């Protein structure tokens, strides 16, 4: 009987270890990320965007920190020195963020959008560590190859991309931070969505844990939080907590009718003025 109990305890302990984030993160990465190859002909839409916003479009290939090939789009508005660097969410690819571009270009800023490793035309495979490194590589390209001053780069994170944008802000000097539909930290989201994850203390989650809350509780660039109040994937209480505990300067804009994936086109009467005011108040 004692041997049977001991074997059962040992089996449970082994299972606990094997499915822990520290050991099984490669498996969890396949669950978290849902990249889609780039396959649509977007020529007409891009031409229309260039014409309407009087901007120049560049299709860009650059290197990730680990040498993989990354793909980006640069919409340059000659009349500005500010660039919004977009780190998108966990699914699709940047062509699925075309609806976001008018929202950002109307601010008067240039926009640089890119695909993480494994997304769109970018080679490799994604992980939480890699998306942070990819954000860093994109920032370095913008500042070193496009010759944009670091203080003129506004980092924009969408969903899981908020973690990449926030982490980037700890590695490089940035001009401002915009987090759309953020979360407090990956361990917190995991615990909220999977009861099993509540058994694991935060230290067993490998770095980076995409801890937006911890990063914003320290000194940071001007911060704008945007969140849909009907978001059923990442509830807006995450943004409220970040807002409550973050250091100044900080601003929170809640969109009453927006969910998780329609922030670009819902309640734009609130999001557009908020974006414009935030960006135009930057030095």
Task: Show which residues each predicted segment covers.
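Catalytic active-site module of serine/aspartate enzymes centered on a nucleophile-bearing elbow/loop
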Residues: 267-283
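Catalytic histidine-centered segment of alpha/beta-hydrolase-like enzymes
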Residues: 258-268
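Membrane-embedded segments
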Residues: 65-141
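Primarily recognizes the serine-hydrolase "nucleophile elbow" in alpha/beta-hydrolase
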Residues: 138-145, 150-197
């Amino acid at each position: 009987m004692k041997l049977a109990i001991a074997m059962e305890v040992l089996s449970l302990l082994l299972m606990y270890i094997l499915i822990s984030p520290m050991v099984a993160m490669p498996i969890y990465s396949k669950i978290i990320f849902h990249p889609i190859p780039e396959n649509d002909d977007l020529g007409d839409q891009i031409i229309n965007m260039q014409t309407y916003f009087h901007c120049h479009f560049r299709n860009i290939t650059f290197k990730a920190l680990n040498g993989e090939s990354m793909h980006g789009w640069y919409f340059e508005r000659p009349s500005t020195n500010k660039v919004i660097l977009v780190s998108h969410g966990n699914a699709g690819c940047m062509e699925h963020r075309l609806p976001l571009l008018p929202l950002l270009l109307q601010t008067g800023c240039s926009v640089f959008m890119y695909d993480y490793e494994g997304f769109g035309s970018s080679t490799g495979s994604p992980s939480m560590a890699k998306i942070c490194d990819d954000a860093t590589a994109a920032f370095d390209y913008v500042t070193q190859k496009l010759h944009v001053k670091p203080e003129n780069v506004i980092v924009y994170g969408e969903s899981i991309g908020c973690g990449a944008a926030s982490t980037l802000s700890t590695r490089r000097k940035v001009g401002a931070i915009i987090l759309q539909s953020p979360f407090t930290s990956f361990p917190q989201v995991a615990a909220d969505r999977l009861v099993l994850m509540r058994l694991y203390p935060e230290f067993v989650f490998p770095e980076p844990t995409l801890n937006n809350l911890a990063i914003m509780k320290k000194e940071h660039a001007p911060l704008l939080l945007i969140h849909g109040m009907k978001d059923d994937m990442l509830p807006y209480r995450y943004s409220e907590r970040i807002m409550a505990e973050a250091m100044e300067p900080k601003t929170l804009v809640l969109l009453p009718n927006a969910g998780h994936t329609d922030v670009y086109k819902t309640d734009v009467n609130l999001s557009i003025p908020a974006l414009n005011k935030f960006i135009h108040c930057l030095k």
